[in-house]
C-alpha cells in the first residue's frame, strides 16, 4: 500500500452548524476539549480515509502510546498521523508507522532560525515539519527532544511537500512505499 495523504484548507471561520456537524467525527474523549476548526477537520479527514480505505463506518477506539501518539489497538495494521495548523489539516495513512506535520509559513525569531540553521522563515518551517514528522513516526515527544537531535532510524525517509500556497509539510516513513498524490478536500466535502 502506498502512503495516502488527505488535506483540507479553510479560508474562513466555520459556522456553528459546521462545527457541530464536524464534532461528530471526534472521539468521545476529545469532544469536550476540541473546539477549533483545524482539529475538527483533521478528525473528519481520518474518518473519511478509514471509510474509503478500510470500509470502517465509525472511528475505532483510540489508544495512546507512551508519548501520546494515537493508534487503533483493534486495527494494528492501520497507522495514521494527524496534523493541523492555522487554516489547514493533513492526514497520512499507511500500513506501517507514519508521521506527518503541516505548518503555515509565518515569521519566526532570529534565535529560532539560528538554532535550526535556517536561512529564512520558510527554511525554518521546512526543517521544523521534517523534525516533527520524524518524531511523530517514531512516537517520540518532540518536546522531550527540544534541545536534542531526533534519533535516526534505519531506512528513514522524509518527504517534503507544499500542500497549499504558504504551507509546508513533511511525511516520514521507514518503509519503501511511495506517496500517492494528496487528496484535497473542502470543508463542505467533509460534512
What are these regions (language model features)?
Residues 1-191:
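Core catalytic alpha/beta fold that binds nucleotide/phospho-ligands
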Amino acid at each position: 500500500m502506498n502512503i495516502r495523504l488527505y488535506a483540507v484548507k479553510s479560508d474562513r471561520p466555520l459556522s456553528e452548524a459546521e462545527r457541530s456537524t464536524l464534532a461528530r467525527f471526534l472521539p468521545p474523549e476529545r469532544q469536550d476539549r476540541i473546539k477549533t476548526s483545524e482539529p475538527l477537520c483533521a478528525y473528519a479527514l481520518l474518518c473519511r480515509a478509514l471509510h474509503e480505505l478500510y470500509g470502517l463506518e465509525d472511528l475505532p477506539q483510540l489508544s495512546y502510546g507512551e508519548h501520546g501518539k494515537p493508534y487503533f489497538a483493534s486495527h494494528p495494521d492501520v497507522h495514521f498521523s494527524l496534523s493541523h495548523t492555522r487554516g489547514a489539516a493533513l492526514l497520512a495513512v499507511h500500513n506501517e508507522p507514519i508521521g506527518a506535520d503541516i505548518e503555515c509559513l509565518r515569521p519566526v525569531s532570529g534565535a529560532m532560525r539560528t538554532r535550526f540553521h535556517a536561512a529564512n522563515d520558510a527554511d525554518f518551517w521546512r526543517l521544523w515539519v521534517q523534525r516533527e514528522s520524524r518524531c511523530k513516526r517514531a512516537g517520540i515527544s518532540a518536546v522531550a527532544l527540544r534541545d536534542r537531535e531526533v534519533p535516526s532510524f534505519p531506512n528513514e525517509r522524509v518527504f517534503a511537500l507544499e500542500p497549499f500556497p504558504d504551507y509546508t509539510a513533511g511525511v516520514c516513513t521507514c518503509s519503501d512505499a511511495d506517496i500517492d498524490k494528496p487528496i484535497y478536500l473542502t470543508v463542505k466535502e467533509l460534512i
